[in-house]
Each structure stands twice: as structure tokens, then as C-alpha cells.
Amino acid sequence: MNIFIGKLAIIFIFHHFLFLYCYFYYIISFTIEFSIFTNIMLLLTLVCIPLLGIVAIAPSYRTEAHRYITNLPANVDPDTHIKLIALVISIITFLYSLILLLLFDPTTPDYQFTFHLLNKHSHTFSSDFQIGVDGISIYFVVLTTFLFPISFLASWKISSSTTLNGNKYNVKFYLCTMLLLETLLILLFIVTDIMLFYIFFESVLIPLFLIVGIWGSSANRIRAAFLLFLFTLAGSLFMLLSILAIYYNVGSTDFQLIQQYSFDPSIQKILWAGIFISMAIKFPLWPLYSWLYRAHAEAPIAGSILLAGIVLKMATYGSLRVLLQFLPDASYYFSPLVQTMAIMSIIYASLATLRQTDFKALVAYSSIGHMGIIALGLFSNTIQGIEGSIILSIAHGFVSPALFILVGAVLYDRFHTRTIRYYRGVVTYMPIFSVFFFLFTIFNAGIPLSANWIGELLCLIGTFQFNPIVAVLAASGIVLSAAYSIWLYNRISFGTYSQYLNFTKDINRREFHLILPLLFLTILVGILPNTILDNIDVSVTTLLYQV
């Protein structure tokens, strides 16, 4: 009897053990499969969120019947609901990108969260939809998603225009164009196929052309939009020829396969020249800068924020991803040429800034100078220089949009003029604005403990290791940036209140919440730069020494 009970107990225990084993086996298997599935879909979901916003906004309409149905008061803009949809979608996209940043593993240089849609090659050409992020691209993605909610808030006052033949879909078209631009920029920074990189690099031009050309601030907006279009198109033709030549040699457009291929030095130089023309226009470097300040001067406030904060960074990312990674010998060979153009950009832009009478053009010229410093760091062929260029790109993505908000949204919305000589003594009636304006002007000049200072310092250290004379010349440009920054603040804020200005209120709650996160992040990165440097170090080191 005891033996029977013992056998029964053994069978019972074995049965439960087998049941628990099968249970945990299926649970673990499902968890692994689900984690693999979610890992694959993470980046694809990030791309789809702004597209869902377009789908939600596009079918909407605004009529008097809609006002009656929704019980909106006569003084309430019926476009508010679609503005809220766009704002919420952009905030969700930003929060989702932060989740990706938290899940990102900075200890490996490999692409993460990869997704590969197609793998079918034709006899003539092959290009697959492949996406992934590494330590370099993840921060450009986060910067992109961060600036779009700010852009939507900055342009909150935009309303449907009655000048375009009574067009009632103006705001809807504007919001859809902005969300499309966000989608294209995200795709640009996450694709791992050079042909797709080219497609999205050039596709960004379409919504930018519409934003500047339709919602620009004056009659010159059409000329500025076409100038932007023609400059970019001219550079893109050379870039396309180089990419086709890369495919002809490698037989693939995959980033990883191209990186493993060793090009002949003479071929590298030809390919490098074709791609660099497009990048030099996007930076922009001297003498290819004339489209930028015109586009900034005519663009709406959201267009200026995105141009300065993200679009110029396409050149930084493209130089890192294509020129330095795939064509390292040619990049080293042409480094003196790039540094000469960068020095000319820094000095010329700084001197031209001192002569400006339009404060949006002044901030635009200052962007040209800062992008010149970024180009110096990129082509210094040092870890410090490249990491400094990434930090300065991020810092410029905070400071320059903040300056455009302060002068292009706050001041221009109140006084309707961008001419600097009409402003004086603003601190008397706008003290909070003056504090923010002071902080960002000194940040723009590279004051210590700001993100700009960290980026400029690392760029100069890297450049000094490559060529001390070039570093000294670049430092003189930074001194000039301090000169025009202090002059601009002194001219607008101090002195007796200008007779050309009406008394007005200080910045409102919406404008305060626009500027505060930019201020916080600029100081945070300046005090704790290792929060970014530690995450990009492996990718930058691999990029520099693997080739």
C-alpha cells in the first residue's frame, strides 16, 4: 500500500512538473517571440505615428455647419481641434522616441531595432526597405521628434487664409505637410540603404518648399522657396550619380555591404566630390549659403525652427553616414578643402551678421557660422572633433530655434517688424522675454556650461590636433559670434523705449512653455555632456577606426 502511494505521489509530482515545464516553456517562447516582434516593429511604429496623424487630420473639414454641430462659440477657431490632433500626435511621437532611446544599447556599434521589408533583387537594380538606428542616428531622431511639438505650438496662431480664393483647407494642408515632413525626416535618419537615404534626403525638399512658398511671411517667399529648391536640386544630381556609381561597384545599396567594400582611392575621390556638393549646400558652406538666409527670412516661424534645428543637421548626418563611413580615404584627402570652406563660412558669416538689419537674417547668418564649426569637427578626423560636431548639432538644434521663437514669434507677433533699428528698451515692459533673450544670446556665443560651449570646445580640440592654425582661425570666428550676440541683445533690450513700438505685454503662457524646455536641455547637456557622449562614443570610435 505504501509502495502504491509512493508511486502515485511520484506520478503526481512528475505530472505537475511536466505541466509546469510545458507552461513555462510556452510562456518563455511566447515572450521571446513577442519581444523579437516588438523589437522589429519599434522603428516601424515610430514612422507610422505621424502618418496616422495625417490620416486623422486629412478627412476633417471646417464649415459653419461644423461650428454649429460642435457648438463652437463665434470667437473660437474651428481649426483648433485639428491643431490639437497634430500637437498630440507629435508629442506621442516624441515620447515614443524617448522609449527607443531608453531601450537603446550604447555598448554595441551595430544597428538596433532593425526591420527589413523586402529582399527581392532584380537584374538591373536592387534596393530594400531597411531601417535601424545606431549611436549616431538615434539622437538625430530624438531631436527631430522633440522639435515638432515646439513647431506646432509656435505656429498655433496660424489660421485658414481667405486670400487663397477663400481656401478653407489651408490649416489642414499646413498640418498634414508638417507631419509629412516629420515622417520623411525620421525615415532619413533610420534607413540603412543608401538609395533610400538619397530618396528621403531629397523628398524633404517637397514639404519644405510648400511651407516656405505658401506660408512665408512676404511676397518674396516664392523666390526664396524656388532658390531653396534649385540649390538643393543642383546638388542632388551629383549625389545621385555618385550613389549609382557606388551601386555599380558594390552591387548593393546596403550600408553594411558598402562599408565592407574597399574602393580604389581615385574612385573614392570622384564619388566623394559628387556627394560632398550636396552636403556643402545643406550645411551650407561658403560660397553655397545664399539660399539659407533668404529661406529663413521668408519662412514662417515653424519653418525657421525646422530649418535651423533639423534640416541643416541632414548635412551633419549625411557626412558622417556616407562620406566618413564609406569614403574615408577621400574624406581625409579633401579635409584641407573642407576646412578652408568652413573657415571662410565662419569668418564671413560672423562679419556679415554684424551688418544685418533684419534680426531673422542675423540669426540665419549665425547658423551658417555654427555649421562651419560643425564641418571643422567632422573633418578633423579625430574622435573629439566628430563627437563635438554631434554635440554642437544638438545644441544648435536647441539654441537657434529658441532665438527664432524669441525674435520671429514673440517680437514680430507684437510689433510686426523685423528691422532691428526700430527696437530699443524692450526690457522695460518685457522683463521675462529679456531674461530668456539674454540667456540664449550668450548660449549662442558659446558661454561655458552651455551645450554650445561643449560642442565648440570639442570641435576646436579635434581641429587643433589636425591643424592648429585652422583651430586658431575658427576661435577668432567664435569671438566674433560673441560680438554680434552681445550687440543684438544690447540694441533690442537696453536704452530708452523706442518711439516706434507700442506698449505690450510680456511673453504669454504658450510662449513660456515653448522656450522653457529648450532652455532646460541646453543647460542640461552643457552640465552633463556625458549623457550623450557615452552613448555615441562606441559608434563614433567604430566609424573612425574600422575603416
Per-region residue spans from a language model:
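Alpha-helical transmembrane segments of multipass membrane proteins
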Residues: I54-A58, F152, I186-L187, L210-I211, ...
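Alpha-helical multi-pass transmembrane bundles of energy-transducing inner-membrane proteins
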Residues: E64-H66, D77-I82, D110, F173-I267, ...
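Short, amphipathic, aromatic/basic-enriched membrane-interface segments that mark the entry/exit
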Residues: W156-Y174, S331-P336, T357-V363, G425-T428, ...
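C-terminal ends of transmembrane helices
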Residues: V55-N71, I150-T163, I211-S217, F283-R294, ...
